[in-house]
């Protein structure tokens, strides 16, 4: 690499790192993801997102005004061709505490799922159960996952289109049994930024399709739709995510989120709007010769606008 290219590479890396660090810091602060004394179990898959999450969290750990531990954990699910040496070698260089767990969920999935069907759903459930249990064993107070903003938005549309639910991935989640708190520090980060960051940092990426499973076709379709929107209407994806943070249950139709049944009017409420302005001059009289402006002198008070007889 030439000196000029190396300089551009470093400049771009620094700029991108600052942006990602700022976005992760904002997400942590907004949702109180990490507190003083926390023991964070950082789940590492070998993909670009989890590498970036660990890298940024370790960076923030050095600058944060609070103290917290980071423990990296990878689950080796015994997929064919999984390079077992890659993650230990990388983590040894970082000098970060880590655990490599081994559980043959691959065989379970292949036994339960017919050939040619997507295995991701069952595989992720088995992985989640193992990681949740291990977090309790080591006394982790938070489990950090590498889902980013695109994952969250895609999940919203997947649940809308195929599940009939307005449901996404929350940046912070309490497990159903109440035993674990899951955090997603990359909730504000764009996937394309994480991909570029991983390339610039030259993380030793492990392919996610070693099991031979095809990508979830429904998720792929939603991703294509969102990418097309992003190209045609710049800023739309940001607006969608902002909308997800500004919900108004009283303006929706979900009876579980708002008590529509008990709504009653207040007969003693002060008059407002059109009722309060009933004694003002009528504004139906426009002076066309004066650029359509209201001619208050020609306006008359209206006692009765229309009378209807039934």
UniProtKB/Swiss-Prot annotation:
MF-aspect GO terms: 4 iron, 4 sulfur cluster binding; ATP binding; magnesium ion binding; sulfurtransferase activity; tRNA binding
Q: Name one GO biological process term.
A: tRNA thio-modification
Keyword Acetylation (UniProt): no
Q: Can you cite an annotated GO cellular component?
A: cytoplasm
Q: How does it assemble?
A: Homodimer.
Q: Pathway involvement? A: tRNA modification
Q: Where in or outside the cell is it found?
A: Cytoplasm
Which residues are involved in binding [4Fe-4S] cluster?
A: 120, 123, 211
Q: How is the cofactor bound?
A: Binds 1 [4Fe-4S] cluster per subunit. The cluster is chelated by three Cys residues, the fourth Fe has a free coordination site that may bind a sulfur atom transferred from the persulfide of IscS.
| Name under which the protein is recorded | tRNA-cytidine(32) 2-sulfurtransferase
Species name: Shewanella baltica (strain OS185)
Q: What does this protein do?
A: Catalyzes the ATP-dependent 2-thiolation of cytidine in position 32 of tRNA, to form 2-thiocytidine (s(2)C32). The sulfur atoms are provided by the cysteine/cysteine desulfurase (IscS) system.
Q: Which UniProt keywords apply?
A: 4Fe-4S, ATP-binding, Cytoplasm, Iron, Iron-sulfur, Magnesium, Metal-binding, Nucleotide-binding, RNA-binding, Transferase, tRNA processing, tRNA-binding
* CDD domains recorded: TtcA-like (cd24138)
**Which cofactors?**
Mg(2+); [4Fe-4S] cluster
For this protein, the record's InterPro entries field holds: Rossmann-like_a/b/a_fold (IPR014729), TilS/TtcA_N (IPR011063), tRNA_Cyd_32_2_STrfase (IPR012089), tRNA_thiolation_TtcA_Ctu1 (IPR035107)
Q: Which reaction does it catalyse?
A: cytidine(32) in tRNA + S-sulfanyl-L-cysteinyl-[cysteine desulfurase] + AH2 + ATP = 2-thiocytidine(32) in tRNA + L-cysteinyl-[cysteine desulfurase] + A + AMP + diphosphate + H(+)
Give the EC number(s) under which this enzyme is classified. Answer: 2.8.1.-
SUPFAM superfamilies given in the database record = Adenine nucleotide alpha hydrolases-like
Q: Which family does it belong to?
A: Belongs to the TtcA family.
Alphabetical list of Pfam families matching this protein:
ATP_bind_3
- Keyword Chaperone assigned to the entry: answer is no
- Positions occupied by motif PP-loop motif: 45-50
* Main EC class the enzyme belongs to: transferase
Q: Which PANTHER family match?
A: AMINOTRAN_5 DOMAIN-CONTAINING PROTEIN (PTHR43686:SF1), SULFURTRANSFERASE-RELATED (PTHR43686)
């Amino acid at each position: 690499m030439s000196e000029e290219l190396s300089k551009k590479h470093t400049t771009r890396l620094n700029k991108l790192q600052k942006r990602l660090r700022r976005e992760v810091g904002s997400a942590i602060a907004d949702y109180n993801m990490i507190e003083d004394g926390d023991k964070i179990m950082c789940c590492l898959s070998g993909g670009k997102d989890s590498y970036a999450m660990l890298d940024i969290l370790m960076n923030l750990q050095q600058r944060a005004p609070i103290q917290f531990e980071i423990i990296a954990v990878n689950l080796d699910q015994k997929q064919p061709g999984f390079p077992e040496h890659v993650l230990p070698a990388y983590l040894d260089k970082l000098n970060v505490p880590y655990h490599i767990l081994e559980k043959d969920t691959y065989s379970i999935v292949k036994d339960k799922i017919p050939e040619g069907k997507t295995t991701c759903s069952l595989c992720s459930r088995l992985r989640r159960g193992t990681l949740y249990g291990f977090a309790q064993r080591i006394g982790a107070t938070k489990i950090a996952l590498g889902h980013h903003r695109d994952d969250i938005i895609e999940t919203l549309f997947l649940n809308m289109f195929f599940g009939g639910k307005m449901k996404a991935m929350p940046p912070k989640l309490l497990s159903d049994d109440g035993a674990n708190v899951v955090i997603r520090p990359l909730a504000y980060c764009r996937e394309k930024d994480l991909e570029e960051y991983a390339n610039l940092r030259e993380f030793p990426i492990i392919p996610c399709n070693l099991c031979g499973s095809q990508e979830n076709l429904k998720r792929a379709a939603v991703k294509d739709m969102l990418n097309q929107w992003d190209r045609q209407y710049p800023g739309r994806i940001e607006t969608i995510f902002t909308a997800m943070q500004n919900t108004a249950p009283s303006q929706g139709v979900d009876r579980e989120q708002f008590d529509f049944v008990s709504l009653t009017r207040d007969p003693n409420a002060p008059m407002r709007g059109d009722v309060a302005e009933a004694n003002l001059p009528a504004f139906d009289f426009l002076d066309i010769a004066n650029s359509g402006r209201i001619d208050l002198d020609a306006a008359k008070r209206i006692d009765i606008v229309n009378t209807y007889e039934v």
